[in-house]
Amino acid sequence: EADTSILLLSYTNRAVDEICSKLKEQSIDFIRIGSEISCDKAYHANLLRNKIQQCRTGDAVAGTLKDARVVCATTAALNSNVNLFKIKRFDLAIVDEASQILEPHLLGLMCARSGNADAISRFVLIGDHKQLPAVVQQTEAESRVTEPELLSIGLTDCRRSLFERLLSSFKTVDG
């Protein structure tokens, strides 16, 4: 739908640039959250900083954000810019490479508020838990969960992504 506000997220800047590439191919306008250092030159004009450069008032900045139908970012970049949710809410967030993203990178976004409403209404997680696992440095012993409340929701190892944990909780007997 034309008025649906979509947030496209991924773990790496390269993956976000790939998303931006597909949007450009389809002539879909978007805002990219990030910096010129982390973003391919082809998308510098789409960076939020550059999109609002001509805005002379706070209302003009807010209007630019509110009017943006598609916003792209890494989870880290969005977590660093949560003030965005004071201005804009999203109908849908699509998270690519979700199997690489640990829960702390997503939980803040999933719980974010915009006024009295959820900042993001729905999430779609896309990934392959057998292909791109979360990147962690902790050992199995350091990552083992022992808290009964966390174990009760299937959180047994802090090295597993939310995507993998959710997937395993919905697997059937047949696999």
Annotate each predicted stretch with a short phrase:
Residues 57-86, 105:
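Conserved helicase/translocase P-loop NTPase motor core
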Residues 20, 42-45, 83-85, 135-137:
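Short conserved micro-motifs at the rims of enzyme active sites and ligand-binding pockets
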Residues 4, 11-14, 26, 76-78, ...:
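Conserved helicase motor core of SF1/SF2 NTP-dependent helicases
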